[in-house]
Amino acid sequence: MWTHPISYDVIVVGAGHAGCEAAFCSAKMGASVLILTSNLDTIAKLSCNPAVGGIGKGHIVREIDALGGIMAEITDRSGIQFRILNQTKGPAVRAPRAQVDKQMYHIHMKRLLESTPGLHIMQGTVESLLDKENVIQGVTTKEGIAYLGKTVILSSGTFMRGLIHIGDRSFSGGRLGDPAATGLSAALKERGFPISRLKTGTPPRLLASSIDFSVTEEQPGDPGVGFVHRDEPFVPPLPQVSCYITHTTEKTKEIITANIRRSALYGGRIEGIGPRYCPSIEDKIVKFADKERHHIFIEPEGIYTQEVYVNGLSTSMPFDVQYEMIRSVRGLENAIITRPAYAIEYDYVHGNVIYPTLESKTIEGLFLCGQINGTTGYEEAAAQGLIAGINAVNKVLRKPDFIPSRQESYIGVMLDDLTTQVLDEPYRMFTGRAEHRLLLRQDNACLRLSHYGRDLGLLSKERYELFEHQKQIIEEEKLRLSKTFKKYGNSVVSLAKALCRPEVSYDTLREVFPEEVRDFGSILNASLEMEIKYAGYIERQKSLIHSLSKSENMTIPEDIDYQSISSLSLEAREKLAKFTPRTIGSASRISGIANADIQVLMVAVKKHAHK
């Protein structure tokens, strides 16, 4: 084993969405960084759907941008369709989503990482960890090289003992066409990490020229919608395309029902649990037997390829069944499959062995982020990469931990959930996971979090000043509109009061009063509308957070002995010792911890402070 002569502050293992974000932000904060990946040609590869964002997920991408991360920027550069979902619903659940060109996403990300000062990229497959007395020292690779580092970030995706299933055929792989990583799982198990299996899947890819789009429903994008917070209209750099909607038929249902036992999922060959909200088509047919048809979304994979992603037809059926199944769908009667669908099982680490900083409780200086923590989705992975990278650098520099709270961000909600809950399925972000989602809208992420990005050195002075200017605009416009009176309908009211009417939006008000109602761009317009229209609800939520903050943020001493607190229930003592929460708020969200236990714990914490 040859030891590389350069030692690094941060070593990142894996160059998926978590790894890229971790490596970039670490280098941006001034650390020397090495990112190791088994294939430089698959950096930031979109292994499943060619899309970024969506409900909950789009909120996270905007938060990453507000903190100084890169997913939003790369998405805007690579996007071939942009939309705002749930436009007719409440403001808390409206979310940006983009179809992206898979190749361009990879190219832009690789180019950005290669040009980032202090960041080195190397092809290599990590097989084991180097540690001494439970402190990380570095990693070793299959190629026979040892790399030394003060901190290590594992972002292995679905590669840890990945096992691909297509019907009755199963074979090792991190994704179709790429080898699995087998040594890393063994290295973690040897060091006492609790590991289990999860499962995910992907649909087949089809040749667009073989599809009859005339019988499908076209789904165009929305103009002027991007992910990066900016002060000018967004103009996508790439040509924009449409997606298309079709549906399964009665014949589809018959084919799946007749072959259900040939599915790897229903044939008993898969032990891992899949994501509840992204089920395979056979799962949908079985669990929703009374439903006549299921929607299928045809999504282009790029502007330089004919391949399309068939969203809604994820399956682990054998290829011959996939062939029949595809051709039973309206518009796909003559479709040509370019890549088969498959399911994949992989190892993940239980959340009770990581802190909310994403540092391991077992080995100091070792951080975990992405699917290795049991999450699913590019966006959840990227956010964890950002947090792991920030805290790895803070550890090297001996600076305080950075843990955004669940009251101020979806990233905080996710960190809290991952470290206080026992996962029984892959974790996916939804707006419903947040208690104060009206405060955590996608349009106000920069207003909530940009001060952290500035303090961490991730946001430039120019971008931070832009966000501060936007805050000022909102406050000034709220006041001005409240003092500007016009006849609207049958009465004279302030424009702020008019905007509070359910049927009135900022854009409709601007059309009626173009001189008085100014255009600040889609994101800022949305923020201004929500701040005025829902002012009462927003103030009530802020008041509630303030009243709960004292107990929520009460710190639990690291050396507290839960077993000695006899008034705690036995289950509470076991769960608290297992998860070792850092605050009373986190402790209260551990399954099995009753309100009475929290009251006892608060008394014990106060007594401990006076020792």
Swiss-Prot record:
Its cofactor is FAD. GO terms for cellular component: cytosol. NAD(+) binds at residues 274-288. One of its GO terms (molecular function) is flavin adenine dinucleotide binding. SUPFAM superfamilies: FAD/NAD(P)-binding domain. Its main location: cytoplasm. It comes from the Bacteria. One of its GO terms (biological process) is tRNA wobble uridine modification. SMART domains: GIDA_assoc_3. It is found in: Cytoplasm. Keywords: Cytoplasm, FAD, Flavoprotein, NAD, tRNA processing. FAD binds at G14, A15, G16, H17, A18, G19. Transmembrane segments: none annotated. Belongs to the MnmG family. HAMAP family: MnmG_GidA. PANTHER family: GLUCOSE INHIBITED DIVISION PROTEIN A (PTHR11806), PROTEIN MTO1 HOMOLOG, MITOCHONDRIAL (PTHR11806:SF0). NAD-binding protein involved in the addition of a carboxymethylaminomethyl (cmnm) group at the wobble position (U34) of certain tRNAs, forming tRNA-cmnm(5)s(2)U34. NCBIfam families: mnmG_gidA. This is tRNA uridine 5-carboxymethylaminomethyl modification enzyme MnmG. The lineage of its organism: Bacteria, Pseudomonadati, Chlamydiota, Chlamydiia, Chlamydiales.
